[in-house]
């Protein structure tokens, strides 16, 4: 898996090349600025998976242009949803946590855990992705993100388990 989160042409071009080599390319939008939308769209088009939070991206009209992608939108305490190959949004419930201390880093835990879960299932190419696999992997990823929210900082789980 090749992961990138910058709109810089060099990272996007590397993603394009990696994708041409059969590598699963994952692009994460940290914050979308409308005036730079063309840069974001180029990055999305060179990726297999596009992830963002509901806080980072408000206007989802571009999703219709991503029919051959997996689009993931995290919804905070409301869970997560995804759109695989333009098949419509599938919403997954949140993993409950009654001891939320800090949500910093939960998006990173979602991403890392999702990629790890895909690998554990042997889903290393875009053609391997099904709604069932994506749902299972996102639920597993939410478990880690939810657990991380019980601790302070982006590496809460790591420091708590030392």
How does the language model describe each region?
Residues 96-162:
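Conserved post-catalytic alpha-helical subdomain immediately downstream of the catalytic base
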Residues 1-93, 122-128, 132-133, 152-161:
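Ribokinase/PfkB-type carbohydrate-kinase core domain
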């Amino acid at each position: 898996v090749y992961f990138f989160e910058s709109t810089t042409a060099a990272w996007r071009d590397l993603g394009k090349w990696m994708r041409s080599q059969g590598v699963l390319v994952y692009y994460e939008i940290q914050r979308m600025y409308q005036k730079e939308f063309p840069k974001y769209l180029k990055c999305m088009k060179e990726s297999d998976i596009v992830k963002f939070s509901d806080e980072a991206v408000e206007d989802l009209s571009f999703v219709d242009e991503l029919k051959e992608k997996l689009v993931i939108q995290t919804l905070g305490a409301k869970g997560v949803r995804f759109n695989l190959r333009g098949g419509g949004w599938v919403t997954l419930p949140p993993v409950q946590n009654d001891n939320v201390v800090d949500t910093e880093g939960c998006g990173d835990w979602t991403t890392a855990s999702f990629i790890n879960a895909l690998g554990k299932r042997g889903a290393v190419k875009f053609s391997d992705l099904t709604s069932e696999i994506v749902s299972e992997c996102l639920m597993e990823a939410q478990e880690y993100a939810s657990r991380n929210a019980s601790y302070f900082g982006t590496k809460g789980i790591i420091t708590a388990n030392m």
